[in-house]
């Protein structure tokens, strides 16, 4: 367990921790010389069944970013106030930050009790309670590092604090120091936000590389594992020259998504805010600049809780519920705290009623299952996105989906309402197509996707179409998808003509035939033959690859299977390969390949073609 100590410079934080633990948290020569904490200092108190870790955060405002690096993933804080000086400038700053980060408990410790009297101390405590409502029910301890007053009572209270660390979620660790140790190699230090890590585990650096854990020091003791809420030093199997890392990077169990530069948040205003203003954003050991924009009005008063968007100048690795500190553009003023509701928020339609209700409900949701249900109301989302946003393992995601009757297909997650909505869009689009083109048999799968649900996951919509074909809501005739009740057919004269046309295609040995050539061969007017061959195309017997040039549909499908086989074996297929396999001229081969591109079966890549949707021409 980690406990943060904060307060004004020279109010005795470091001395208090030395009295509690026997360890001085000043670790830089400059700190010892100046008598103030500049970077994060650490002390440890071994107990019977655990080790308490204390982070001594710097009190001087110049070192605020260092202070904020120590607050991520911690549930308890001690506010240090000197009895002889009371609430000072940095005390107020730290109080605001502690309130914004919403610690489970803030313990107020009055130090230097030997320098004043009990009446003055009681007056100070009452002033704090009166001025800071969130500390009225806090526990107060009166101490002196010089005389030992109150130290044992405080130590006993801290030893009995409940463990609140979330060890069940994936491991997530913010790096605040990186250095090399002779004989050991790369070492990082930081705080574990969540999860568990063990020696020899392979985890991700936030830049994407996988790294093995060689050794662990948890709470300043060699250990086989580290858990959430602990201060950890990790010896990594990584060369800093080959795998650069720095303060602000992360070590992660889940493969990270790309960092985000646009987020939706709920803020608690510390000062009156305008609709839009530049801000400095602090998260874990990271710091960047950006723009804060209110979503629910032109301004916000102090203590207002409201929805907002933050556009980051440098992207951050954020997840739902992460806490941010926002300071003014000149960094002089703490203006708000923020809780992340959504990463990669949309660029348009940010203030619609539906959108604001969605964000408000996210803020009110009590668990991941409820938030996932909200996210999946109208869209499918990848499992990887949900696992990252909610910081869940794959099994935890499956459990959350099951609680909401949601479904996971390959990497996509969706709910039954989404399936119903999209399948109805498919049926509606196909019905409109039949009304407007009643002489056409149907459409290809790729075209149906574009007609009905463009901008939805293509492989997922194809899956829905396949299910609709299986259960009879759709039918497929010679590759063309249509509604079951939609029919077109030849009359008696056309049936006879089809026999003659089919005979000509058999003579052509798999070649395409032009309308005029077929008309000449059968001594029929070209316009009549054109209308007939296009009707045969609508019935699915023939397929035009360019205007007036047709293949037998079954032959075209055979060629598609051949090309699919080549592309799957080699990863690509060229015009020359197809020309040689089919014994075509180059012009016909190019027309065939371009037709397959248009149908969504292939996609041109340089001088080759690769499979786009290998199932388009499956019968």
Swiss-Prot record:
<feature type="region of interest" description="G4">
    <location>
        <begin position="111"/>
        <end position="114"/>
    </location>
</feature>
<dbReference type="Pfam" id="PF03144">
    <property type="entry name" value="GTP_EFTU_D2"/>
</dbReference>
<dbReference type="InterPro" id="IPR015190">
    <property type="entry name" value="Elong_fac_SelB-wing-hlx_typ-2"/>
</dbReference>
<dbReference type="Pfam" id="PF09106">
    <property type="entry name" value="SelB-wing_2"/>
</dbReference>
<feature type="region of interest" description="G1">
    <location>
        <begin position="7"/>
        <end position="14"/>
    </location>
</feature>
<dbReference type="InterPro" id="IPR027417">
    <property type="entry name" value="P-loop_NTPase"/>
</dbReference>
<protein>
    <recommendedName>
        <fullName>Selenocysteine-specific elongation factor</fullName>
    </recommendedName>
</protein>
<dbReference type="InterPro" id="IPR015191">
    <property type="entry name" value="SelB_WHD4"/>
</dbReference>
<comment type="similarity">
    <text>Belongs to the TRAFAC class translation factor GTPase superfamily. Classic translation factor GTPase family. SelB subfamily.</text>
</comment>
<feature type="binding site">
    <location>
        <begin position="111"/>
        <end position="114"/>
    </location>
    <ligand>
        <name>GTP</name>
    </ligand>
</feature>
<feature type="region of interest" description="G5">
    <location>
        <begin position="144"/>
        <end position="146"/>
    </location>
</feature>
<dbReference type="Pfam" id="PF21214">
    <property type="entry name" value="SelB_WH_2nd_bact"/>
</dbReference>
<dbReference type="InterPro" id="IPR000795">
    <property type="entry name" value="T_Tr_GTP-bd_dom"/>
</dbReference>
<dbReference type="GO" id="GO:0005737">
    <property type="term" value="C:cytoplasm"/>
</dbReference>
<dbReference type="InterPro" id="IPR036388">
    <property type="entry name" value="WH-like_DNA-bd_sf"/>
</dbReference>
<feature type="binding site">
    <location>
        <begin position="7"/>
        <end position="14"/>
    </location>
    <ligand>
        <name>GTP</name>
    </ligand>
</feature>
<keyword id="KW-0648">Protein biosynthesis</keyword>
<dbReference type="Pfam" id="PF25461">
    <property type="entry name" value="Beta-barrel_SelB"/>
</dbReference>
<dbReference type="InterPro" id="IPR036390">
    <property type="entry name" value="WH_DNA-bd_sf"/>
</dbReference>
<dbReference type="GO" id="GO:0003746">
    <property type="term" value="F:translation elongation factor activity"/>
</dbReference>
<dbReference type="GO" id="GO:0003924">
    <property type="term" value="F:GTPase activity"/>
</dbReference>
<dbReference type="InterPro" id="IPR004535">
    <property type="entry name" value="Transl_elong_SelB"/>
</dbReference>
<dbReference type="Pfam" id="PF00009">
    <property type="entry name" value="GTP_EFTU"/>
</dbReference>
<dbReference type="InterPro" id="IPR009000">
    <property type="entry name" value="Transl_B-barrel_sf"/>
</dbReference>
<feature type="region of interest" description="G3">
    <location>
        <begin position="56"/>
        <end position="59"/>
    </location>
</feature>
<feature type="binding site">
    <location>
        <begin position="56"/>
        <end position="60"/>
    </location>
    <ligand>
        <name>GTP</name>
    </ligand>
</feature>
<feature type="region of interest" description="G2">
    <location>
        <begin position="35"/>
        <end position="39"/>
    </location>
</feature>
<dbReference type="GO" id="GO:0097216">
    <property type="term" value="F:guanosine tetraphosphate binding"/>
</dbReference>
<comment type="function">
    <text>Translation factor necessary for the incorporation of selenocysteine into proteins. It probably replaces EF-Tu for the insertion of selenocysteine directed by the UGA codon. SelB binds GTP and GDP.</text>
</comment>
<keyword id="KW-0342">GTP-binding</keyword>
<keyword id="KW-0547">Nucleotide-binding</keyword>
<dbReference type="InterPro" id="IPR050055">
    <property type="entry name" value="EF-Tu_GTPase"/>
</dbReference>
<dbReference type="InterPro" id="IPR005225">
    <property type="entry name" value="Small_GTP-bd"/>
</dbReference>
<dbReference type="GO" id="GO:0001514">
    <property type="term" value="P:selenocysteine incorporation"/>
</dbReference>
<dbReference type="InterPro" id="IPR004161">
    <property type="entry name" value="EFTu-like_2"/>
</dbReference>
<dbReference type="InterPro" id="IPR048931">
    <property type="entry name" value="SelB_WH_3rd"/>
</dbReference>
<dbReference type="GO" id="GO:0005525">
    <property type="term" value="F:GTP binding"/>
</dbReference>
<dbReference type="GO" id="GO:0016259">
    <property type="term" value="P:selenocysteine metabolic process"/>
</dbReference>
<keyword id="KW-0963">Cytoplasm</keyword>
<dbReference type="Pfam" id="PF09107">
    <property type="entry name" value="SelB-wing_3"/>
</dbReference>
<dbReference type="InterPro" id="IPR009001">
    <property type="entry name" value="Transl_elong_EF1A/Init_IF2_C"/>
</dbReference>
<dbReference type="GO" id="GO:0035368">
    <property type="term" value="F:selenocysteine insertion sequence binding"/>
</dbReference>
């Amino acid at each position: 367990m980690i406990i943060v100590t904060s307060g004004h410079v020279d109010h005795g934080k470091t001395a208090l921790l030395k009295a509690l633990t026997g360890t001085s948290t000043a670790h830089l020569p400059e700190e010892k010389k100046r008598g103030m904490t500049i970077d994060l200092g650490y002390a440890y108190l071994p107990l019977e069944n655990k080790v308490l870790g204390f982070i001594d955060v710097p009190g001087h405002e110049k070192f605020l970013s260092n202070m904020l690096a120590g607050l991520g993933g911690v549930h308890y804080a001690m506010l240090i106030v000197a009895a002889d000086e009371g609430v000072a400038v940095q005390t107020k700053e730290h109080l605001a930050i502690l309130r914004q980060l919403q610690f489970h408990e803030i313990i107020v410790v009055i130090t230097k009790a030997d320098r004043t009297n009990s009446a003055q101390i009681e007056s100070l405590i009452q002033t704090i309670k009166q001025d800071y409502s969130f500390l009225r029910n806090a526990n107060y301890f009166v101490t002196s590092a010089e005389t030992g007053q109150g130290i044992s009572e405080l130590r006993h209270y801290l030893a009995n604090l409940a463990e609140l660390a979330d060890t069940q979620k994936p491991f997530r660790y913010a790096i605040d120091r990186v250095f090399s140790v002779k004989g050991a190699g790369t070492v990082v230090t930081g705080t574990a936000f969540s999860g568990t890590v063990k020696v020899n585990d392979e985890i991700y650096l936030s830049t994407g590389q996988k790294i093995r854990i060689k050794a662990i020091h948890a709470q300043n003791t060699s250990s086989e594992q580290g858990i959430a809420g602990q201060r950890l030093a990790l010896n990594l199997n990584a060369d800093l020259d080959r795998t650069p890392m720095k303060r602000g990077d992360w070590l992660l169990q889940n493969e990270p998504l790309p960092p985000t530069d646009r987020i939706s948040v709920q803020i608690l205003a510390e000062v009156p805010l305008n609709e839009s203003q530049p801000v400095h954003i602090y998260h874990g050991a990271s710091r960047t600049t950006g723009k804060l924009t209110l979503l629910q009005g032109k301004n916000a008063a102090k203590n207002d809780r409201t929805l907002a968007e933050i556009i980051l100048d440098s992207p951050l690795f954020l997840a739902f519920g992460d806490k941010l500190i926002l300071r003014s553009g000149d960094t002089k003023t703490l203006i708000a705290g923020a809780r992340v509701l959504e990463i990669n928020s949309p660029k348009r339609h940010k203030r619609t009623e539906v959108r604001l209700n969605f964000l408000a409900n996210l803020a009110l949701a009590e668990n991941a299952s409820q938030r996932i249900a909200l996210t999946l109301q109208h869209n499918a989302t990848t499992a990887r996105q949900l696992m990252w946003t909610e910081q869940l393992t794959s099994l935890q995601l499956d459990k959350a989906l099951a609680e909401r009757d949601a479904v996971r297909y390959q990497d996509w997650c969706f709910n039954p309402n989404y399936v119903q909505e999209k399948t109805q869009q498919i049926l509606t689009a196909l019905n409109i197509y039949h009304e407007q083109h009643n002489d056409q048999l149907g459409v290809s799968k790729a075209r149906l996707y574009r007609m009905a649900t463009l901008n939805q996951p293509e492989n997922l919509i194809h899956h829905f179409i396949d299910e609709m074909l299986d259960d009879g809501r759709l039918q497929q005739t010679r590759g063309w998808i249509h509604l079951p009740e939609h029919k077109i057919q030849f009359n008696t004269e056309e049936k006879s003509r089809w026999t003659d046309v089919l005979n000509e295609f058999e003579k052509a040995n798999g070649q395409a035939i032009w309308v005029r050539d077929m008309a000449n061969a059968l001594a029929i007017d070209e316009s009549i033959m054109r209308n007939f061959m296009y009707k045969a195309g609508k019935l699915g017997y023939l397929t035009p690859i360019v205007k007036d040039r047709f293949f037998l549909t079954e032959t075209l499908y055979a060629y598609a299977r051949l090309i699919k086989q080549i592309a799957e074996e080699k990863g690509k297929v060229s015009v020359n390969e197809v020309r040689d396999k089919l014994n075509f001229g180059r012009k016909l081969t190019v027309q065939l390949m371009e037709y397959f591109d248009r149908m969504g079966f292939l996609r041109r890549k340089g001088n080759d073609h690769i499979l786009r949707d290998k199932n388009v021409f499956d019968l």
